[in-house]
Regions:
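Bacterial Sec-dependent N-terminal signal peptides
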Residues: 1-26
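Short active-site loop at a secondary-structure junction
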Residues: 37-48, 54, 70-130, 165-177, ...
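Short, surface-exposed beta-strand/loop micro-motifs that present aromatic residues
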Residues: 323, 330-343
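Short, well-ordered beta-strand elements
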Residues: 341-350, 354
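A short acidic/glycine-rich loop-to-helix N-cap element
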Residues: 352-363
Length: 381
């Protein structure tokens, strides 16, 4: 009799789990529809979406294939993506938070304190904060790859750059500024940027699939980005897409990091948990609040992070005004809403086969709106 009861109980448990899974799939059907339609419309060949709410992952799903060829590998939740500019927040801004916490620099310190050669062509008074909020006056980027330059040539040209506008006058998103922040982090820590991030962020957070320069054994698990027909003349897979980062040996403050949705969620969960990790303070709550809040009414920029714009935000309509996030050129994004205790990680390889495809610009807000609607449906039950 006891055995029968146990068998019956086990069957009930299995049934409950199945119902729960079906219910959850139904609840997030709106999200599935957005992504499946985007793949059908060839906005990108594949994607991973992860939704975290109130302390746990409530949705994580892979869609599509590595390419539009259905015989190519299917995307898995463990698929590794070239993060492009999401590197700026997952690596460089997080590293800057840690340096700030440890009093290795002040945001108001001038760049020339650490890089004297930077102080030419009117850049003597630019601060670390100016670089992180993108109002330094530096150019957005340069086509270094069109010339025969080595690592030192690129760095020296960044340091000697002329300003395109007066520092503090306006906000212009600049790769050059964040590359410079990465070099400052190397100066104050005595470690390369990739080594510091590995030691102080990725290993402690158990982000085991997050790294610069994936080795040969890992590349097959990376979603391909672009078929490069103008510089490297090959399909890029497990090799950084960003040309400037490639010229800097794949390690730079603005781009170069590879990761998974699950790994990114570990970092974001720590930030949403007020900086706590395993009952220890990984980053001070006050530091997180400082870096993720909009700095000025004249811009959406926070310190390293971006915030939601009044209209046309990639976070959609329903994320709160306190939301912070970042996008990446390859088709990646993170958006977090502290008011809702929610974040969404959205990884795609929209560049495949060409960067001319910008359909993701419409998909991003649709996805985030669908997430909010699905969560509201859960709350209504």
């Amino acid at each position: 009799m006891k055995i029968r009861i146990k068998i019956f109980a086990a069957r009930i448990l299995i049934l409950a789990l199945r119902v729960g899974a079906q219910s959850n799939a139904y609840i997030f059907n709106d999200v599935d529809e957005v992504i499946n339609k985007a793949i059908e419309d060839k906005s990108f060949p594949g994607a991973v979406v992860l939704v975290w709410k109130d302390g746990k992952t409530v949705y994580e799903k892979a869609f599509g294939n590595f390419t539009y060829d259905r015989s190519s590998p299917k995307v898995k939740t463990t698929t590794i993506y070239d993060l492009a500019s999401v590197t700026k927040v997952v690596a460089t801004t997080t590293a800057a938070m840690i340096c700030y916490d440890r009093n290795l620099f002040s945001l108001d310190y001038k760049v020339v304190k650490y890089i004297p050669e930077f102080g030419v062509n009117g850049k003597e008074n630019i601060t670390i904060k100016n670089l992180l909020i993108h109002n330094s006056g530096l150019p957005a980027w340069k086509k270094f790859y069109e010339r025969d330059l080595n690592y030192d040539d690129v760095i020296n040209e960044i340091y000697s750059s002329e300003l395109e506008y007066k520092t503090g006058e306006k906000t212009v998103y600049s790769d050059l500024g964040i590359i410079t922040v990465g070099k400052i982090i190397e100066k104050v820590t005595g470690r390369s940027l990739d080594k510091f991030c590995e030691d102080e962020i990725f290993i402690p957070l158990k982000m085991n699939s997050t790294f610069y320069n994936p080795n040969d054994s890992v590349k097959q698990f990376c979603a391909p980005t672009e078929i490069d027909n103008y510089w490297r003349m090959k399909t890029l897979q497990g090799e950084v897409h960003d040309e400037t980062s490639a010229m800097l040996n794949g390690v730079a403050g603005h781009a170069g990091l590879f990761s998974t949705a699950s790994d990114i969620s570990k970092l974001m969960a720590m930030l949403m948990n007020k900086g706590e990790l395993d009952q220890k303070q990984f980053i001070k709550q006050s530091t997180i609040e400082l870096f993720t809040k909009k700095v000025s009414t004249n811009s959406t920029r926070a310190i390293g992070w971006d915030t939601k714009s009044d209209s046309g935000s990639s976070s959609g309509t329903y994320f709160s005004k306190d939301s912070f996030g970042h996008t990446g050129y390859t088709g990646t994004s993170i958006w977090a809403d502290p008011v809702r205790n929610l974040f969404v990680v959205f990884l795609t390889n929209r560049l495949y086969p060409t960067r001319e495809n910008i359909k993701i610009q419409k998909v991003r807000p649709q996805l985030h709106d669908a997430v909010i609607k699905c969560l509201e449906r859960i709350n209504a039950k």
